[in-house]
Amino acid sequence: MAAAAAAATVEAVGVAGGRRRRSGSVALGDLLRREASAERASASASAGAGGRERERRPSVAAGQACRAKKGEDFALLKPACERLPAGGAPFSAFALFDGHNGSGAAVYAKENILSNVMCCVPADLSGDEWLAALPRALVAGFVKTDKDFQTRAHSSGTTVTFVIIDGYVVTVASVGDSRCVLEAEGTIYHLSADHRFDASEEEVGRVTECGGEVGRLNVVGGAEIGPLRCWPGGLCLSRSIGDQDVGEFIIPVPYVKQIKLSSAGGRIIISSDGVWDALTVDTAFSCARGLPPEAAADQIVKEAIASKGLRDDTTCIVIDIIPPEKISPTVQPAKKAGKGLFKNIFYKKATSDSPCHADKDQCTQPDLVEEVFEDGCPSLSRRLDSEYPVRNMFKLFICAICQVELESGQGISIHEGLSKSGKLRPWDGPFLCHSCQEKKEAMEGKRHSRDSSSRNSGSSE
């Protein structure tokens, strides 16, 4: 009956228009069949495109090696993680944790940091939206991990270097001095920051302004020895997870860099300071060139121990991002390392033995590794102040760090001047719960929770 009525309606329209077009009459059943057929064709095309996209994605192979001295280094290798809810392309996650003053913080971070980061990513994002949300989620996940661990009243701490690989996009978040380095098409790129006080005058200034004291260890006679350290506690790092006995100004806010590799792929090395205190970056890559990841990591650790002995836990993770057309990874000979922070893109750098040195005309179009995102600012307010995708507005009324749901009047805006606002308005967010706001204030030096102690005391690292 409904189909007949629909056909009659189509025919009547033809008559009203002054022309009788029985050939234009279409039954509702035919319309539905055509629409279903079109949807099937569209779904098939999408599936084919998705399959082709998966075929174009690189494979990821990884291996690790460790020689223990104190038993405080830990590694996380998850080459195939699934985004939830299911449907998105899989990603890989790798992390290195170099603990100090005990292994508690390193073990806790290894067990919790991935889930803490992922719970800060809104659900149902497209691939590009998911990648764009990662830098903020990494900041929130690191701070949540630190905040939750400190409720356990442990005095240990840990560095964290956390790597997420999605296709050719690599996102790295780091606190501490466990460096992450990439070699792509013969060029070396530094993807992490060094948070030792000796490496950053800005971090020395930040900690001092927040109430900490930075100096070297005093010995008998008034001489100062060793690296710069923060007192109380004697920690030589300005950022870490844990370290409750040192001070809240030792913050867990990570340096984050996101890059996109060319289709040539590349090799990544993540190592604790047991490796980097013994080997240069060039040596680490060259001594393991041509080896698969597991053997490469083992070789790098062996070289480090042969150079300086086993003075500390020595851990290495090697990750190969392999283009689909390559059966096995091929790592190009290394050129001079690019160092420091890069803006927008990385350019290949030639050394004296590079073909570019002999013929500059052949190097006018260098291959690029695109920098998508970079931020190492210690301000939690700035690092969390980025918008969610519009279709995930409901997340605005959840604490940006611990992800608890906020009721009316409970949330505190991260923006200055709005922290005492009673009624939540979407444009005032993101928001923090009261306990996360206290954590933020302590990290900024607005609330001191530790007593000072002498620089003559023992050191944490």
From Swiss-Prot:
Catalysed reaction equations from the record:
O-phospho-L-seryl-[protein] + H2O = L-seryl-[protein] + phosphate; O-phospho-L-threonyl-[protein] + H2O = L-threonyl-[protein] + phosphate
CDD domains from the UniProt entry? PP2Cc (cd00143)
Binding of Mn(2+) 2 occurs at 98, 273, 312
Matches recorded under SUPFAM superfamilies:
PP2C-like (SSF81606)
Spell out the coiled coil positions from the record: none
Indicate the segments forming the PPM-type phosphatase domain, all copies: 57-321
Q: Does the keyword Metal-binding apply?
A: yes
Q: Per the UniProt entry, what are the Gene Ontology biological process annotations, in alphabetical order? A: regulation of intracellular signal transduction
Transmembrane ranges? none
One Gene Ontology cellular component annotation?
nucleus
Q: Where is this region: Disordered?
A: 34-63, 439-461
Task: Kindly indicate where the leader peptide sits in this chain.
Answer: none
| Main location, first listed in the record | nucleus
Which family does the record assign? Belongs to the PP2C family.
What is the protein name stated in its UniProt record? Probable protein phosphatase 2C 40
Q: Which organism is it from?
A: Oryza sativa subsp. japonica
